[in-house]
Amino acid sequence: MPQLSPMNGLLIMFSVTLMLLIVLVINHFMLTPMASPLLASHLKTKKSGGEKLYY
């Protein structure tokens, strides 16, 4: 297995964190227009295995 240079590792970490950040931002903006009770119930279903709907 080729050893990654510190720069490559940093680049990979940066891209991964950037992707996660983008996903979080998109989720946030998609959920914002909803009413707060809807948001609460949505988060509850998401926690209780509602993730299946997203994949």
UniProtKB/Swiss-Prot annotation:
One of its GO terms (cellular component) is mitochondrial membrane. The chain crosses the membrane at residues 11-31. It comes from the Eukaryota. It is a single-pass membrane protein. One of its GO terms (biological process) is proton transmembrane transport. The keyword Membrane applies. Keywords: ATP synthesis, CF(0), Hydrogen ion transport, Ion transport, Membrane, Mitochondrion, Transmembrane, Transmembrane helix, Transport. The keyword Endoplasmic reticulum does not apply. It is found in: Mitochondrion membrane. Mitochondrial membrane ATP synthase (F(1)F(0) ATP synthase or Complex V) produces ATP from ADP in the presence of a proton gradient across the membrane which is generated by electron transport complexes of the respiratory chain. F-type ATPases consist of two structural domains, F(1) - containing the extramembraneous catalytic core and F(0) - containing the membrane proton channel, linked together by a central stalk and a peripheral stalk. During catalysis, ATP synthesis in the catalytic domain of F(1) is coupled via a rotary mechanism of the central stalk subunits to proton translocation. Belongs to the ATPase protein 8 family. F-type ATPases have 2 components, CF(1) - the catalytic core - and CF(0) - the membrane proton channel. This is ATP synthase protein 8. It comes from Albinaria caerulea (Land snail). The lineage of its organism: Eukaryota, Metazoa, Spiralia, Lophotrochozoa, Mollusca.
